[in-house]
C-alpha cells in the first residue's frame, strides 16, 4: 500500500506564511473550490437552486459575495468559482452538483489552483506594483481577472485597502509566491 502525504502548492506539509515589513503573504489551503457555470436556458432555475445552496445570490461581473459558509467569485459570464471550507466540503463538486442538478455544470478545481492572501496596511501599495488593476479603488468584494508577472490570476479584495487574495494556477505557485514576496520586500 502506498503511503502518500498531501502537500501544499508550495510543496510543504503545512501552508506557508511569509512577512516583509507590514505585509503578510499566506498560502491558503483550507478552502475547496469548484467552478460553476449556468447551463443554457436554465438561468431562472439556477438562480433559485444557487440561492438555496449558497445562501447568497451569485454576484454580478467584477464582484464576489460571501455568506456564512460559501464565497462565490465571478469569473466570466454566468460563471463563478465557489469556495467553501475544505474540512466540510472536500467533495465540493459533488455537493454542488447534487444541489444544482441540471441547472449548472460543475467542475472540481481545488487542486488546480493556489491562493495567496496578502494582508497589511500597505497591501494596496504592494498590489499596485504587481498588476494593472485599480486596487486602490477596489471595494470589499471586488473581483477581477488580471495578469501578475505574466501569470493569469484572479484578484479578490477581501477587505478594502488591506486584504487581497490572488488565485493562480497551481503550477505557478512558486513563481507567484516569488513575485508576491519581491513586491512585498520592495515596499518594506
Regions found by a protein language model. Give the residues of each.
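Basic, glycine/lysine-rich polyanion-binding surfaces/domains
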Residues: 1-188
Amino acid at each position: 500500500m502506498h503511503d502518500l502525504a498531501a502537500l501544499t502548492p508550495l510543496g510543504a506539509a503545512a501552508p506557508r506564511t511569509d512577512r516583509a515589513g507590514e505585509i503578510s503573504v499566506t498560502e491558503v489551503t483550507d478552502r475547496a473550490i469548484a467552478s460553476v457555470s449556468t447551463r443554457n436556458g436554465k438561468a431562472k432555475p439556477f438562480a433559485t437552486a444557487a440561492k438555496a445552496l449558497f445562501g447568497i445570490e451569485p454576484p454580478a461581473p467584477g464582484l464576489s459575495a460571501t455568506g456564512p459558509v460559501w464565497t462565490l467569485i465571478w469569473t466570466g459570464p454566468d460563471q463563478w468559482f465557489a469556495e467553501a471550507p475544505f474540512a466540510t466540503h472536500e467533495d465540493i463538486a459533488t455537493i454542488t452538483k447534487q444541489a444544482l442538478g441540471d441547472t449548472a455544470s460543475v467542475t472540481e478545481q481545488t487542486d488546480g489552483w493556489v491562493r495567496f492572501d496578502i494582508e497589511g496596511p500597505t497591501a494596496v501599495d504592494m498590489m499596485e506594483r504587481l498588476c494593472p488593476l485599480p486596487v486602490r479603488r477596489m471595494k470589499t468584494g471586488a473581483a477581477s481577472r488580471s495578469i501578475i508577472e505574466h501569470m493569469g490570476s484572479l484578484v479578490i479584495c477581501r477587505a478594502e485597502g488591506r486584504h487581497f487574495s490572488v488565485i493562480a494556477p497551481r503550477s505557478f505557485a512558486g513563481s507567484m509566491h516569488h513575485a508576491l514576496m519581491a513586491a512585498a520586500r520592495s515596499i518594506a
